[in-house]
A protein has these predicted regions:
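Charged, amphipathic alpha-helical regulatory modules used
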Residues: 2-113
Length: 113
């Protein structure tokens, strides 16, 4: 028989992969917006809450959309992610901003009236 394989040195386990959705120390970077400051702040706060609460981009987008539908009347659309393109039609109100590595595009399209 050949020599025994060498045992690997034991040390602390490697750190877990970064969960880029978590909102720790995220600063909002506004790219474009037609919203009032108050509405923009609501979008950022809803996004931070969604990033803390959920683990997928779709869940975060759903959280933001539902908050805006309930607060500012339907119909809002939301896209959340690190890499996407868009070409949209909107009704006067939209915002596009980053929280850390995550981009958020939120816009109103249509109404419930």
């Amino acid at each position: 028989m050949g020599p025994k394989p060498k045992a690997k040195a034991k040390g602390p386990p490697p750190p877990p992969p970064e969960n880029y959705l978590k909102s720790e120390n995220k600063v909002a970077v506004l790219k474009e917006s037609t919203m009032s400051k108050a509405m923009q702040d609501s979008a950022i706060n809803a996004a931070l809450e969604g990033l803390d609460k959920y683990n997928t981009e779709s869940e975060v987008a759903g959280h933001i959309k539902q908050f805006f539908d309930n607060t500012y009347k339907p119909f809002w659309q939301c896209t959340v992610g690190r890499n996407f393109g868009s070409f949209i039609s909107y009704d006067d109100l939209y915002t596009y901003f980053y929280l850390g590595k995550v981009a958020i595009l939120l816009y109103k399209n249509g109404s419930a009236d």
